[in-house]
């Protein structure tokens, strides 16, 4: 029986019950909160990365936007660790599920937009009509800008889902090809296996880059509204 190509993206269950909630909570165990005065190297590295990311993202924000710093650093750490854990054999990647990514994107986007309408009402409404727009084009541009605003969370979720899913599918296909070529052409199988190793290294980079891109876009939406 041939294995379904998308079987690895099915939500895992235990005794008929979905255990995706436990999988989502698992990355939090990788970031402990030590009680010792002197941290070890792992915790020090995590803190250094968090400070570096915050410095890059919070530089452009106003004091109101910087109150979101803890949420943004938690978001990038969660998505990055989830993507990396999904590269382990026989594991499940929650970020390949569009429903989960929409569950992250919509509240974050809505929070940024609501913040903008609450504290910068005129500036937020001005985004719907660019300055210098000819009068006949005003209705059409307002509709276009409104659609572009509401499509932002969908673009956030689809981008993350598509990139992670495509990488996993490509690794699955190349891995299956390498296994099938072992008995036919060992030399070709070796070349395919080397390509698979290089692709795996690339996927590690993609996992971190997609976490950064998702968080950066949320940060930009927040910057536009604070």
Swiss-Prot record:
GO terms for cellular component: mitochondrial inner membrane; proton-transporting ATP synthase complex. It is a multi-pass membrane protein. It comes from the Eukaryota. Keywords: ATP synthesis, CF(0), Hydrogen ion transport, Ion transport, Membrane, Mitochondrion, Mitochondrion inner membrane, Transmembrane, Transmembrane helix, Transport. The chain crosses the membrane at residues 12-32, 68-88, 97-117, 138-158, 164-184, 189-209. It is found in: Mitochondrion inner membrane. It catalyses: H(+)(in) = H(+)(out). CDD domains: ATP-synt_Fo_a_6. PROSITE patterns: ATPASE_A (PS00449). NCBIfam families: ATP_synt_6_or_A. Subunit a, of the mitochondrial membrane ATP synthase complex (F(1)F(0) ATP synthase or Complex V) that produces ATP from ADP in the presence of a proton gradient across the membrane which is generated by electron transport complexes of the respiratory chain. ATP synthase complex consist of a soluble F(1) head domain - the catalytic core - and a membrane F(1) domain - the membrane proton channel. These two domains are linked by a central stalk rotating inside the F(1) region and a stationary peripheral stalk. Belongs to the ATPase A chain family. Component of the ATP synthase complex composed at least of ATP5F1A/subunit alpha, ATP5F1B/subunit beta, ATP5MC1/subunit c (homooctomer), MT-ATP6/subunit a, MT-ATP8/subunit 8, ATP5ME/subunit e, ATP5MF/subunit f, ATP5MG/subunit g, ATP5MK/subunit k, ATP5MJ/subunit j, ATP5F1C/subunit gamma, ATP5F1D/subunit delta, ATP5F1E/subunit epsilon, ATP5PF/subunit F6, ATP5PB/subunit b, ATP5PD/subunit d, ATP5PO/subunit OSCP. This is ATP synthase F(0) complex subunit a. It comes from Oryctolagus cuniculus (Rabbit). The gene is MT-ATP6.
């Amino acid at each position: 029986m041939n294995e379904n190509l998308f079987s690895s993206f099915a939500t895992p269950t235990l005794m008929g019950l979905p255990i995706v909630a436990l999988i989502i909570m698992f990355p939090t165990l990788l970031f402990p909160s030590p009680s010792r005065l002197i941290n070890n190297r792992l915790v020090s590295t995590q803190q250094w990365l968090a400070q570096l990311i915050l410095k890059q993202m919070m530089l452009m924000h106003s004091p109101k936007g910087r109150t979101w710093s803890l949420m943004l650093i938690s978001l990038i750490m969660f998505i990055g660790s989830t993507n990396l854990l999904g590269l382990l054999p026989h594991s499940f990647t929650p970020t390949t599920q569009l429903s989960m990514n929409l569950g992250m994107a919509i509240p974050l986007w809505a929070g940024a937009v609501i913040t903008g309408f609450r504290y910068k009402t005129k500036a937020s409404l001005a985004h719907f009509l660019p300055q210098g727009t000819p009068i006949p084009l005003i209705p059409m541009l307002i509709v276009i800008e409104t659609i572009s605003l509401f499509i932002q969370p969908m673009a956030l979720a689809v981008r993350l889902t598509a990139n992670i899913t495509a990488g996993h599918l490509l690794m699955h296909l190349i891995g299956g090809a390498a296994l099938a070529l072992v008995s036919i052409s060992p030399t070709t199988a070796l070349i395919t296996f080397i390509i698979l190793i290089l692709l795996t290294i690339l996927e590690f980079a993609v996992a971190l880059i997609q976490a950064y891109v998702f968080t950066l876009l949320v940060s930009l939406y927040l910057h536009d509204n604070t």
